[in-house]
């Protein structure tokens, strides 16, 4: 088991625990706790690690959990339970759960102590870390949200080991993202260790999760609130990926949409002359290596192009008709590029037809 702390803000450190018994950290929390957990989580697996007063609240999974009206229902739980700013909110579940629970923890009384316990690979390496919380509104994903850092991130690998391999694969797109634009060593590890990663070897999973968390937190530490143009690197694949999700009515798993989004955006970078020769091929190869989709033809749902382009035009990163995008220049490196939204829509239309 690996445990370390990162100082993201001057107010507090974030404890990070990765390993097969990471849940034991919860025994250190003696304060009153509201535990919001995915209905797919076996709560009996969690209870032995809980001490002191706590309230268990099963919640919805997936995009249903991220509806703004549902967030109001969860806030009422905190209000009715008499929770105050000295108490804790614990989110146990996938990315949609940590997104939603992080949002309510940050807004109730302007902030309660938050602990994220992601139970999927996607949650452990992306959605459950970094402090961005969001819910959906008006057909647009994550358009209402906050920046709010958790007190701790607990990545207990036993959750992953018990998941079907396909669920682990869905989260690998985000891991591969770090390798493509931030961390060549991680890319090389993934290239050489496919079998151990997909077979959920604990040592390989521990390395992949720890490395991904450190990659993301290093970016967040430098640009927590997206004011310096650094954190945008974490959006690689997400501009087109979110459009794909919207165009499918959010029926396509996030990881698969991001996988196709990374291929599209790597191609755009190449066509605009920002990436070295071979970057597109290396992107396609590593995603195919892990049996992730590389084109919309490989996705399970049809994409409504009009809806996808509408979502693209409503992207939060658009300023004065221009979108700031992270383009891979070589494996493990990237460049910030301003792309006119109409130009991007033209490229996206080619990619999504």
Swiss-Prot record:
**Which sites bind Zn(2+)?**
174, 238, 254
Q: Which reaction does it catalyse?
A: 7-phospho-2-dehydro-3-deoxy-D-arabino-heptonate = 3-dehydroquinate + phosphate
Which keywords fit this entry according to its UniProt record?
A: Amino-acid biosynthesis, Aromatic amino acid biosynthesis, Cobalt, Cytoplasm, Lyase, Metal-binding, NAD, Nucleotide-binding, Zinc
The job of this chain, per UniProt, is described as: Catalyzes the conversion of 3-deoxy-D-arabino-heptulosonate 7-phosphate (DAHP) to dehydroquinate (DHQ).
Q: Which coenzymes or cofactors are required?
A: Co(2+); Zn(2+); NAD(+)
Keyword Cytoplasm included in the entry's annotation: yes
Task: Specify the species.
Answer: Sulfolobus acidocaldarius (strain ATCC 33909 / DSM 639 / JCM 8929 / NBRC 15157 / NCIMB 11770)
Q: Tell me what this protein is called.
A: 3-dehydroquinate synthase
| GO cellular component terms attached to this protein's record | cytoplasm
GO MF annotation, one: nucleotide binding
> Could you give a single Gene Ontology term from the biological process aspect?
chorismate biosynthetic process
Return the EC number. Answer: 4.2.3.4
**Gene3D superfamilies from the UniProt entry:** 3.40.50.1970, Dehydroquinate synthase-like - alpha domain
Q: Where does NAD(+) bind?
A: 61-66, 119-120, 132, 141
Q: Where in the cell is it found?
A: Cytoplasm
Gene name, please? aroB
Q: Which residues form the signal peptide?
A: none
- Cofactor binding mode and count: Binds 1 divalent metal cation per subunit. Can use either Co(2+) or Zn(2+).
Q: Does the keyword Ribonucleoprotein apply?
A: no
Q: In which pathway does it act?
A: Metabolic intermediate biosynthesis; chorismate biosynthesis; chorismate from D-erythrose 4-phosphate and phosphoenolpyruvate: step 2/7
Enzyme class, broadest EC rank: lyase
Q: Hey, which family's this protein in?
A: Belongs to the sugar phosphate cyclases superfamily. Dehydroquinate synthase family.
